[in-house]
């Protein structure tokens, strides 16, 4: 059997903290949230645009 490698670099290396999705990731300010989760949580984080 082959050992499963973890992705070390590139777009698939990071995932959303809430749902684990790897696409549409917002890494700015160390958020590591996908865009869908960010929209749900943005007001709690203090982003005024999404109040």
UniProtKB/Swiss-Prot annotation:
Keywords: Metal-binding, Ribonucleoprotein, Ribosomal protein, RNA-binding, rRNA-binding, Zinc. Zn(2+) binds at residues 16, 19, 34, 37. Its cofactor is Zn(2+). InterPro entries: Ribosomal_uS14, Ribosomal_uS14_arc, Ribosomal_uS14_CS, RIbosomal_uS14_euk_arc, Ribosomal_uS14_sf. One of its GO terms (cellular component) is cytosolic small ribosomal subunit. It comes from the Archaea. The keyword Amino-acid biosynthesis does not apply. GO terms for molecular function: rRNA binding; structural constituent of ribosome; zinc ion binding. Binds 1 zinc ion per subunit. GO terms for biological process: cytoplasmic translation. PROSITE patterns: RIBOSOMAL_S14. Belongs to the universal ribosomal protein uS14 family. Zinc-binding uS14 subfamily. NCBIfam families: PRK05766.1. HAMAP family: Ribosomal_uS14_2_A. Binds 16S rRNA, required for the assembly of 30S particles. Part of the 30S ribosomal subunit. This is Small ribosomal subunit protein uS14. The lineage of its organism: Archaea, Methanobacteriati, Methanobacteriota, Archaeoglobi, Archaeoglobales.
């Amino acid at each position: 059997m082959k050992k499963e490698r973890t992705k070390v670099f590139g777009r698939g290396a990071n995932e959303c903290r809430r749902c684990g999705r790897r696409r549409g990731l917002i890494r700015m300010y160390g958020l590591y949230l996908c865009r869908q989760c960010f929209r749900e949580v943005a007001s709690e984080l203090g982003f005024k645009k999404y109040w």
